[in-house]
Amino acid sequence: MPDDKLEVALDVMGEMVFAPAFAELDAEREVVLEEIAMYEDQPQELVHDLISEATFGTHALGRPVIGRAEVISSVSRRVLSGYHRSMYVPGNVVVAAAGNLKHEDFERLLVQVQRRAAAPAGKGPKVRPALVKPPPPGLRFQRKETEQYHVCVAAPGIARSDRRRFAASLLDGILGGSASSRLFQEIREKRGMAYAVYSFASQYTDTGQVGIYIGTREDNVGPCLEIASEQIADIAAGNVRPEELTRAKDNLKGRIMLSMESTSNRMSRLGKSLITDTELLSIERIMAEIDAVEPEALAELADVLLAPEKLSAAGIGPDEDRFLAAVEHVNPGLARAA
């Protein structure tokens, strides 16, 4: 917002967060149910919910962010109000800002907002327990009459505070995080087996997730996962080329530098640091950490995080047997136990 509207904006946000009216609850319920229905018709997105459930089981990280239709349909105003009273308290709220403002003035405005909104004092309960030990690898499949199979293979990753996070980002870039990555080149560019193929990596407070996504026709599911398995094994064996690592480092550093041109990204960076209780590193320190990553670190991470016996799998498509046959290429034990 314009910097001269900061006080007004904080007043509105404070009222929304600490004193919502919960008006038009039934209408909003219908909107969310429509959003869930729309999501169900997008298998390339839905499969990511399935792989989270396969990876994290019944833990909160395994649940869809948008919620489930049966819960949204039945939740009452009383339940929502009770949850809000216990969780939306100042001790649980992180406020981050970036732009033309002074820290002291911002703090003063926040205190005023809290008073005007009559926000309760104290700190609420934790939103979720820590993931002490990940569950065994899981398998999820949803049968749909789709033209393509949408497949994710993933495993628990590393926390946002882990020193190896820079190596993990580079591993993601080399494996499938860009148009020059191995999976994109081997599966799409050289063989034309898929339009969408990529790797992904998320880092949370106490764990993370690493994995790959492939959307392809039935005949290509097995060969695509076989290629993915081969590329993971090749990186784990230490076969990262010097120019490959240099390109990944340049790409990662460039994206970080470009992101710093956005005030919104700077704000998000501050907020994530507070939420996850991690050190806020200077840009110079981040660049140095990226430059310091050696090929051996990538090999070790690939070997530890993406070992076949640790991989979960999720798929959406017409035939579960075809999906299970393909999964044998990445985690034979998981497929045979299904």
Where in this protein do the model-derived segments appear?
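Charge-rich, well-structured scaffold segments of protease-associated domains
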Residues: M1-G124, A130, F141, T146-V151, ...
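Active-site cores that bind ATP or allylic diphosphates and position pyrophosphate for catalysis
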Residues: P134, I187
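Flexible, small-/acidic-enriched active-site or ligand-binding loops
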Residues: P137-G138
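Helix-start/capping segments and mature chain N-termini
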Residues: L170-G173
